[in-house]
Amino acid sequence: YLYVKNPAENGALYFKLNDNWKAVDGFVTVKEGVETGDPGYEDGADYYIEGLFVYVGPSGGDTAARLSTGNTGKDAWTGTLFDEVWVDEGAKKTDLTDETGKVYDMEVTALLHQASDGEGGNLAADADTWAKDQAGKLAGGVDGVGSDEGL
């Protein structure tokens, strides 16, 4: 699970997920109105401003993929969540900078990056609930992100 926090205002920055990733329903802010000719446009694609995303792997299922190298001591990796971030054509400088003029940074946080705890415990068993709880804490009450339980 990865959480993307985007402080830019008015949907000024947005991205499209790479293959094998899926938005966690109820925990993302969708970028509406991306049309032909807009930066990054791809027919039929969904665009996001921020939120919680899960690696589902090539199966394209609804649950987190279990990565395995089949070899203890080796690492297994997902692909990247997104390759580019686009700026909305209607964005203003004030949408992209704070009150001091500093350009906003998007933050990407890995919430669950391994299936076991190193002692044989299964971290993936409650991963969905745990990741949503952590995303809620990171969101800090961002409108349009999360569930009715205060995300």
Residue positions per predicted region:
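Surface-exposed, hydrophilic segments of mature proteins
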Residues: 1-151
